[in-house]
UniProtKB/Swiss-Prot annotation:
EC number: 2.4.2.1
Official protein name in the record: Purine nucleoside phosphorylase DeoD-type
Gene3D superfamilies xref list: Nucleoside phosphorylase domain
Provenance organism: Shewanella amazonensis (strain ATCC BAA-1098 / SB2B)
Gene Ontology biological-process entries: purine nucleoside catabolic process
Amino acid sequence: MATPHINAVEGAFAETVLFPGDPLRAKYIAETFLENVEQVTDVRNMLGFTGTYKGKRISVMGSGMGIPSCSIYATELIKDYGVKNLIRVGTCGAISTDVKVRDVIIGMGACTDSQVNRLRFKGQDFAAIADYSLLSAVVESAKTHGIQTRVGNVFSADLFYTPDPEMFDVMEKMGVLGVEMEAAGLYGVAHEFGARALCVVTVSDHIRTGEKTTSDERQTTFNDMIIMTLDAAINL
């Protein structure tokens, strides 16, 4: 039952899918943390895998960069493959001095400069929020693992190279924790089609200070985030 962008067979995906932007990161997660792994889709090299984690069937698939790409895959996973839970796992940039590089952020809500949710909400402002049961499960898992998290708003930007850097001042004033490019679209799709979604990201760089993580630091922090998320996923 292939879709225009996914060539998996019916039943290939688990009810819960971890959803990194990078398909190679999806491959890394599958090969590092899952057992009995099978690659289930590879259209446009947007790789997807299904395996087991501590006996629980889990899938992982790349979403691509930005709301349009993420929304395509999220829609098809939910509507055509029956996926119930989508958890974005990725990275973000920080803007506030209170937020540090390597912090783990859980996106309770997602602000955006994109118009996609206004389009689906007939011109009105839609509150793009995470599913509470997913959020609380990941928060509790983080506590169990001793991983400190920050819970609040992220900002899903349409432009990576923004022409309006003064907007960062507004974001900081309004308490936005991190800037990424997918969560608002993912939350909108999930609400539209009756699924549950959450965004969990690590801070890879600081927009204000220019501080960046090394590749080794990024991988270590990312691994901690994945383990905490997977341990939450098996209890959904």
